[in-house]
Amino acid sequence: MKNRLIILALGLSPPGTMGGNSKITVEMARCLAGKREVRFILPENKLATLTNNVPPDHGIHIHALPAFTGEDKLNPIAATRWFTPRLRSVLREISAGPDDFLYCCSDFHIDVLPPYTLQKEFGFRWLPSIFLFVPFVFENLSRGYKFPAIKYIIYWLYQRALFALMKHRATGFVVTNRSDFTRFPKRFTGKLFDYYGGVNIEQIPSAPLPKRRDVVFCSRLHPQKGIDAFLDTWKLIVQAISAKDLSNVSNPKLTIIGNGSPSYESYLKDKAQRLGIANTIEWLGYVNNEAKFRIYAESRVFVHPTVFDNNGMVAAEALCTGLPVVMQDLPALRDVYTTGCLKVPFGDRNAFAAAVVSLLTDPAEYAATAPTPDQLTALRAHWKWESRAAEFDRWLDTL
């Protein structure tokens, strides 16, 4: 009998959004529910994020806690006091103990402080996750990420403090890139798992669709994802193609999938107006599952202009749908994406624009870059969620 997996997902994305950590957590539960007993603990106001993304016969034991009525990110002490006794009640109800793994879906305080407080009481094997280490202010400024400096100093200090607590009582850690292993003490050797995410292969259209879209971007709308600078790049792309006067791509269109804070979305749309490219962009907001893969299948090129990342599952989704991907050459992604991509120097908008233009206008370049049928088969086998979950399941058995 395999050890039970308890998933604590108080920091799960709310319905209508889906962060990478939440996607990994939901798919982990879906894929492992048939292999070991899975208990999923989350706030009741986030229940739909789970149930809308797993089949009705998922086999997951769900425990929905009363939601914290305030803003949990702004009230860490109150939120922790709210969730800790409620988590304790569930752990007592299910007789949690030393044979159980307790995995946390985020490194937010609501997913760290309650299990840290309760770990000695119940003795469970704690598996925190850190899916992205916050860059220190010098990296932020030197690399031109344009993240708010003061805000990100606070984020960095906040994460470092919680990381210290995690290291004190954790059995192991889950990260999303092997390059992060160097951040951990040697005593965690063999106790780190790089969960790179996956792709819902079954949601990809089985037959080719007409390519009625030119370029597609999909991500949370946030400065980290590079969408701000890409609007400038998109203007260069539109101008370059217009100058070529090509009949097949005379009026290129950009499809943007994703949402963000209302203020940032307004900023981006206002910028598109100022740049004179608003009529070339379709803003679709949050789209997920089959509808998202249909949009991919209708598109010719996927762009991944993220400025700070260590995984980027949307690029894998696009590649598994057969699209070529243009991305910045980030060190953390060099070993993750080696097929079907054109990589350009970081921050070089002209090079990024030239790569997209070449794929849209040069059939030979497109054919040489897009995944071949054999590569597509290999990509899908590598990235399907079931493969990722099986690797994680085997790792659990070694702890």
Outline where the language-model segments fall.
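Conserved donor-binding/catalytic core segment of Leloir-type glycosyltransferases
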Residues: 208-225, 231-236, 255
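Conserved acidic donor-binding segment of nucleotide-sugar-dependent glycosyltransferases
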Residues: 341-350, 358-364
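Active-site donor-binding acidic/aromatic loop of nucleotide-activated sugar
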Residues: 263-266, 278-288, 295
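Glycosyltransferase donor-sugar binding loop
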Residues: 218, 251-267, 285
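N-terminal subdomain of nucleotide-sugar transferases
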Residues: 1-53
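Short hydrophobic beta-strand element within catalytic cores of glycosyltransferases
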Residues: 324-327
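Donor nucleotide-sugar binding/catalytic pocket of nucleotide-sugar-dependent glycosyltransferases
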Residues: 151-205
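Aromatic "clamp/platform" in nucleotide-sugar-dependent glycosyltransferases that forms part
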Residues: 307
